[in-house]
Amino acid sequence: MERLDARKMKMEEVELTENIGLPVNLLEKHDPWPAYVTYTSPMVKRLIEKSKARELECLQTVEESRRVGKQSKPASLIQLKRRKSSKSSGTTTFKDLRSETMLSVWGPLTMSAMGPSGVPEPLHLHSDSRASPTASYNKIIFARAPTMRTLPYTAGRPSEMFCI
């Protein structure tokens, strides 16, 4: 009994903390470190601001298009009128009947966009990768090429190895 009482008195004097076992007087002198990093670099802050501004701009354009769509006609009735330009470059343009904006399918003619036959390949119009992932976008880039998969070697004849 006396041992337990002495032990309790000793514990009350020291007052250990429950997580790391340091005395309270040491913890009061030093501020605890945060469990995670709270510093954000200025470059990351600028990128976050640009991203928020871009999202806000997209939301505003969507709201404006909804307002205009409700006033004139439903969005399902919007049609694109296709017309060939008189240029010999072969670019095709689309004209939106409502907003009179022009979109070029071919984009600027570059050597990288030219196909093997000399005809330019169309550049894909893509506004937001989260909205519609495609085969050419949202690819995962690995640091190393995956290892070659080989069939296990067996001691049998080659004709027996590949029989299904």
Curated annotation (Swiss-Prot):
<dbReference type="Pfam" id="PF15213">
    <property type="entry name" value="CDRT4"/>
</dbReference>
<feature type="region of interest" description="Disordered">
    <location>
        <begin position="65"/>
        <end position="94"/>
    </location>
</feature>
<dbReference type="InterPro" id="IPR029185">
    <property type="entry name" value="CDRT4"/>
</dbReference>
<protein>
    <recommendedName>
        <fullName>CMT1A duplicated region transcript 4 protein homolog</fullName>
    </recommendedName>
</protein>
